[in-house]
């Protein structure tokens, strides 16, 4: 029997309240559970001590028996110092996808072309100006 330490939703519509329970993975989210080990009230401020209550001893017991916490419960237990959750890092997820990379490359190329054109335009009048001054000097002499 695979066990999970998870949240079971209670409370009224738009007023969530969760119980931290030990349940078989096959049972429904709000259905049958083995033991209630705490509560979670997301409506309270994060610094409120009543926001999350967990019986640490029972959580340790169930973890030693082999129950696995869900992601949210793992955060709670990690904050309590009972469970260490794995650091999650997926650098591939934040990379732009193929179409976005094509757009970025096109924008980069357009920017380089604009910079090259501006540089060429800046150099062209500079070359013509000294050439225009040379005939004027010859006319004065």
Swiss-Prot record:
Lineage, highest ranks first: Bacteria, Pseudomonadati, Pseudomonadota, Alphaproteobacteria, Hyphomicrobiales
Organism: Parvibaculum lavamentivorans (strain DS-1 / DSM 13023 / NCIMB 13966)
Family: Belongs to the bacterial ribosomal protein bS16 family.
HAMAP family hit by this protein: Ribosomal_bS16 (MF_00385)
GO cellular component: cytoplasm; small ribosomal subunit
Biased composition (Basic and acidic residues): 89-111
Region (Disordered): 84-141
Protein name: Small ribosomal subunit protein bS16
Gene3D superfamilies reported in the protein's UniProt record: 3.30.1320.10
Chain segments annotated as transmembrane: none
Signal sequence, renumbered to the chain: none
Keyword vocabulary terms for this entry: Ribonucleoprotein, Ribosomal protein
UniProt feature, compositional bias: Low complexity: 115-141
A GO term for molecular function: structural constituent of ribosome
UniProt xrefs under InterPro entries: Ribosomal_bS16, Ribosomal_bS16_CS, Ribosomal_bS16_dom_sf
Domain of life of the native organism: Bacteria
Gene Ontology terms describing biological process: translation
């Amino acid at each position: 029997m695979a066990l999970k330490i998870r949240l079971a939703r209670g409370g009224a519509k738009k007023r969530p309240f969760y119980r931290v329970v030990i349940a078989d993975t096959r049972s429904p989210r709000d259905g049958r559970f083995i033991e209630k080990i705490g509560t979670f009230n997301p409506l309270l401020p994060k610094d409120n001590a009543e926001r999350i209550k967990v019986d640490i001893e029972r959580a340790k017991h169930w973890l030693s028996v082999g129950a696995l916490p869900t992601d949210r419960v793992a955060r709670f237990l990690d904050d309590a110092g009972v469970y260490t959750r794995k650091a999650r890092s997926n650098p591939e997820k934040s990379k732009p996808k193929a179409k976005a990379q094509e757009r970025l490359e096109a924008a980069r190329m357009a920017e380089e072309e604009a910079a090259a054109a501006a540089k060429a335009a800046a150099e062209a009048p500079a070359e013509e100006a000294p050439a225009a001054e040379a005939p004027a000097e010859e006319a004065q002499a």
